[in-house]
Amino acid sequence: MKYAHVGLNVTNLEKSIEFYSKLFGAEPVKVKPDYAKFLLESPGLNFTLNLRDEVNGNQVGHFGIQVESTEEVVAHKNRLAENGILSQYDEINTTCCYALQDKFWIHDPDGNEWEFFYTKTTVEENSTHPPTCCVNEPNVEKAECCSPTASSNKDTSNCCS
């Protein structure tokens, strides 16, 4: 297998190209008026953006990029922040999908969630939290707390874990 392929419907191709260029640290290899293609070698990914008039909700649970260390999670978070893409929420030593992980989450221009995560070890027990870590489910409390429009003086220390 050479490449995994994801075709993502988007409502604003220009904003999406800008976002994903920053996310992947690469420019698309092909751009048309209604289409853009990123071809990444590591990880092997053929990722296309397909312009649509509307996208109704998050049609996927979430996307993720697994890295090899907590330091790499932090490096990606810092790299994206330097490019204007801020973490929506961070999870350190969180139990998710029967694994102990460090991660952070961001959203693309259409609201699709991406996580950068490092799996420290497997665990026998799954999280006691609602299953939003592995499957995206609407969480109004988390969204209000962790959204970029949330008040900067609001205490968010416990709402995003």
Curated annotation (Swiss-Prot):
Cofactor: Fe(2+)
The EC number(s) this enzyme carries: 1.13.11.-
Domain VOC: 2-119
Catalyzed reactions: methylarsonous acid + AH2 + O2 = arsenite + methanol + A + H(+); roxarsone (III) + AH2 + O2 = 4-hydroxy-3-nitrocyclohexa-2,5-dien-1-one + arsenite + A + H(+); nitarsone (III) + AH2 + O2 = 4-nitrocyclohexa-2,5-dien-1-one + arsenite + A + H(+); 4-aminophenylarsonous acid + AH2 + O2 = 4-aminocyclohexa-2,5-dien-1-one + arsenite + A
Pfam families from the UniProt entry: Glyoxalase (PF00903)
Function: Nonheme iron-dependent dioxygenase that can break carbon-arsenic bonds, playing a role in the detoxification of environmental organoarsenical compounds. Catalyzes the oxygen-dependent demethylation of highly toxic methylarsonous acid (MAs(III)) to arsenite, which can then be exported out of the cell. Can also cleave the C-As bond in several trivalent aromatic arsenicals, including roxarsone (III), nitarsone (III) and (4-aminophenyl)arsonous acid.
PANTHER family: CADMIUM-INDUCED PROTEIN CADI
NCBIfam families: ArsI_CadI_VOC
Domain free text: The thiolates of the vicinal cysteine pair (Cys96-Cys97) directly coordinate the arsenic atom of the organoarsenical substrate.
Note: Organoarsenicals are used as herbicides, pesticides, antimicrobial growth promoters, and chemical warfare agents. Arsenic is the most widespread environmental toxin and is classified as a Group 1 human carcinogen.
Protein name: Trivalent organoarsenical cleaving enzyme
Natural source organism: Bacillus sp. (strain MD1)
Gene designation per UniProt: arsI
